[in-house]
Regions:
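Extracellular/periplasmic bilobal clamshell ligand-binding domains
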Residues: 237-265
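Hinge/capping helix and adjacent helix->loop/strand transition within the periplasmic-binding protein
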Residues: 17-24, 38-121, 125, 173-179, ...
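Structural recognition of the beta-strand scaffold that forms the well-ordered cores
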Residues: 4, 25-29, 86-89, 111-114, ...
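Extracytoplasmic "Venus flytrap"
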Residues: 1, 7-12, 87-95
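Mature extracytoplasmic/periplasmic domains
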Residues: 169, 206, 217, 221-244
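C-terminal lobe and pocket-closing loops
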Residues: 143-216, 248, 255, 264
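Short helix-initiation/N-cap motifs at beta->coil->alpha
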Residues: 6-14, 113-128, 137-140, 239
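A ligand-binding cleft/hinge motif common to bilobed small-molecule-binding domains
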Residues: 30-44, 94-106, 120, 128, ...
């Protein structure tokens, strides 16, 4: 079995999907390249709905984190802000930029400053008071738990029901934008995928999926993830991912794909 590591282009996914033998080539990848296929980007020559999924690192939770001393310690206070609230982000395609853009599309007074070269730099900027907030995965504070423990930042909105009493992102946007939210949040909801080409024989895919589940439950594997600061969500089984991916592709209409691209502006 050959494993292909992520590359800065959808080419490996294209190879696995369109030319790889059904028995041997697999791709370990963040879901972003599968989104390229879901939105029917001309650069992608693969259909993510047809690939064989072995498993993933699983669902994670993100939140909108704010410095309470900025005057915003709840989503209601954010909505009441008289001026747009600045959030730090990496780049136009990162979730810390696209999720706030989706909120802004729905009337939430936020704007994003992009260009930080790492989430750690954004967290440092927040700590130093340069920007008051960030949309960030909870596990992203693994190296800076003090920011949460000392309430330098507090969550005011979340993507999964983790923090009691906090509103969910999907509940504060228009119902018509929820398919768009599914696309924006796909990275955290699919996790890091292990995917192979279409038409892998059922007995082989079942064996691979069983092995992936066994690995995910292994304490040494979990300890390795913790040491490497790899986000650890709730692992997803391959058949679950396949069903989710088909739904994502089916619900990503041309209008949704166009709206997704506009969030990058």
């Amino acid at each position: 079995m050959a494993i292909q590591q992520p590359a800065p282009a959808p080419a490996p996914s294209e190879h696995v999907s369109t030319t790889a033998q059904p028995s041997y080539n697999f791709r370990a990848a963040a879901v972003v390249w599968f989104i390229v296929g879901a939105v029917k980007n001309p650069a992608a020559r693969f259909d993510p709905a047809t690939m064989t999924y072995v498993g993933s690192s699983g669902v994670m939770n993100s939140a909108l984190w704010m410095r309470p001393d900025s005057g915003i310690a709840s989503f209601a206070q954010l909505l009441a802000a008289k001026e747009k609230v600045v959030l730090g982000a990496l780049n136009a395609t990162s979730q810390d930029s696209m999720a706030p853009a989706l909120l802004a599309r729905n009337g939430v007074p936020v704007r994003v400053i992009r260009g930080y070269n790492s989430s750690a730099k954004v967290l440092l900027a927040i700590e130093q008071g340069e920007v008051p907030g960030i949309f960030h995965i909870v596990d992203g504070f693994a190296k800076r738990p003090d920011l949460i423990e000392n309430k330098v930042v507090v969550p005011v909105l979340q993507t999964q029901p983790m923090f009691p009493g906090l509103p969910l992102l999907r509940d504060v946007i228009r119902a018509s934008d929820r398919p768009l939210a599914n696309l924006v949040l796909a990275g955290e909801e699919f996790g890091v995928l292990l995917a192979g080409p279409p038409a892998i024989p059922a007995d082989r895919s079942a064996l691979l999926r069983q092995a992936f589940t066994t690995m995910s439950d292994d304490k040494d594997y979990q300890a390795d993830l913790a040491r490497m600061d790899v986000p650890r969500g709730t692992p997803l089984a391959g058949d679950t991912i396949a069903s989710m991916m088909r739904t994502l592709v089916e619900t990503t209409t041309p209008d949704i794909a166009a709206a997704y691209e506009r969030l990058k502006e």
